[in-house]
């Protein structure tokens, strides 16, 4: 690790992946490792050779891979103007364990990040997945302000409709906080 960049050297077994899974594997690797404190980017090697394309593709990659690459991407674009890229953390539950899954959404929007995050947490990200958000579609963000790196959000009373306070405190707060990070 040098200047926030972690260098990893893999053997050729990493190339044993289907072409259409290659990018997703790399995105997950980048997102997982840059979540660790002090790691801002990755440089990847395969048996001491710099990785210049996604495995089993011709798609070029930058020398230093960062979270700018996105993860689990959804595209909602109708032009190349005013494109925003926001990563929203949705919830997935398996048995009694709750996971927070990042989804990078690329869309045409002039809204700020807070408005985009709340808007997307009020909707379901994928029609056919187990990703959820406990933020109700009827919830309205009344007001927000940022003071000294702290975000204060005021919601309509509908925020608590049909949800236990425990679920509200944990899942909604964590999803919003991770998404605004």
Residue ranges and their predicted role:
Residues 1-181:
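Bimodal "functional hotspot" detector
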